[in-house]
Amino acid sequence: MSAQKSAGIQLLLDAEREATKIVQKAREYRTKRVREARDEAKKEIEAYKAQKEAEFKKFEAEHTQGNQAAQEEANAEAEARIREIKEAGNKNREQVIKDLLHAVFTPSPEAMAAH
């Protein structure tokens, strides 16, 4: 019986070694699949990100042109108003200076009102 026990024990040890190899291969395969899945997910994320960035740039380009035109129009209006104000200032400059000098150098006695 000793030989049978020894053969049985040896058979169990061989089966255990074989099971260990199978488990190890399964772990390696699972690890490999997890890495592959992670890499695939990264690629999908990058592709999605690139697509959304392209869509955003297209949207931005379409809408920036309208804003740019409005901004240019506003700038033109502002410059026109500035020119008008400068022209009005230049036109009345002499009279304003005369009035200021007259007011400063010509005393006019006025009674101080009690507050």
Swiss-Prot record:
It is found in: Vacuole membrane. It is a peripheral membrane protein. GO terms for cellular component: vacuolar proton-transporting V-type ATPase, V1 domain. Keywords: Hydrogen ion transport, Ion transport, Membrane, Transport, Vacuole. InterPro entries: V-ATPase_G. The keyword Calcium does not apply. GO terms for molecular function: ATP hydrolysis activity; proton-transporting ATPase activity, rotational mechanism. Belongs to the V-ATPase G subunit family. V-ATPase is a heteromultimeric enzyme composed of a peripheral catalytic V1 complex (components A to H) attached to an integral membrane V0 proton pore complex (components: a, c, c', c'', d, e, f and VOA1). Subunit of the V1 complex of vacuolar(H+)-ATPase (V-ATPase), a multisubunit enzyme composed of a peripheral complex (V1) that hydrolyzes ATP and a membrane integral complex (V0) that translocates protons. V-ATPase is responsible for acidifying and maintaining the pH of intracellular compartments. This is V-type proton ATPase subunit G. It comes from Neurospora crassa (strain ATCC 24698 / 74-OR23-1A / CBS 708.71 / DSM 1257 / FGSC 987).
